[in-house]
Amino acid sequence: MSRTPTGRKRIDEPKRILVVKFGSLGDVVHCLPSVQQLLDHFPNAEIDWLIERKNQTVVEMSGLGVRIVPIDTYQWRNSPGIGSAKEILEFVWSLRTDGYDCTIDFQGLLKSAFFGYLSAAPIRIGWERDFLKESTSRFFYTEVVTPRRVHIIDQQMELLKPLGITPKWDTTTQLRPPATARTSIERKLDGFSDFVLINPGGAWKTKRWNAENYGKLARRLMDDGLPVAVTWGPGEERIAQEIQEFAGGSVRMVPASLQELVALCERARLFVGGDTGPMHFAAAVGIPVVAIFGPTSSDRNGPFRREDVVVERRMECRPCYERDECPLGHLDCLVRITVEQVYEGCMKRLAFEALNATGPLN
């Protein structure tokens, strides 16, 4: 054994590591490069991933050699009773007796830190208090890291340092859907190809650029000869229909499951959408991205590749990270983003891709 930066004993070759990252979908994508490096650095270790059951499909599509430990905290919170209590106790007992040497809390929430603590691992790694979503999480860590970098993917890689891992900042992990999802999307597209994919939705109301703007953007792109497809998430079909109406009815509507969404991204020429899971899926698939940012920070959460385009308004009040409504009542960070700005972003990203495809001029 050697010593961690804080002087505690470090397990140089851990046999079992518990990764804690519940979600959301985009957050899980951000965590993949760090877990990839754990696997590369400790090829003989067993690495388990504690994740919300609804998000485990993302890890499955990554192809990473981890054991998924699904958890359903939503059901536990909303279905209290003897059955749930028994299930929780059995889960905690299993966690404590699995013999983990180390846990890494990539989430930074009180519940994620607490579950890491319940694992009884002697080394529990997390961020310093100022970088946590819930500062009380700090009490459950034995090792804390103060990130030096801005992007969340980099910050998560920095959590590997107490284990003696020097982060490889260029590590990427691509998502690959199952063959059944690819076949389903091929059937839905029915020959439709070389298209721009728009995903207008998002769990946060404050991240959604309005349907009229997306519709006008689709119209501009189609006038340039670029086919446009629109997809959406649960409860967002009406937004997609409004885009179709504002665009003049000629966009391709493609409903998709989570796995089908990744397959759909594989077939797209360009992705356009907000700071949501689908945007991060598109980036992880490797297609060009134009991301529209409102109340969140593109420096921290934006697409990781430098060639991808972020459209945003630099304002003193952002980022505020408000989910449901603008605290100032205007949401100018999103409302003031014009169709022309996003259209120009699309042209810029497509031009870069075309230049990259042809190679440097002689």
Where are these regions (language model features)?
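Catalytic machinery of carbohydrate-active enzymes
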Residues: M1-N362
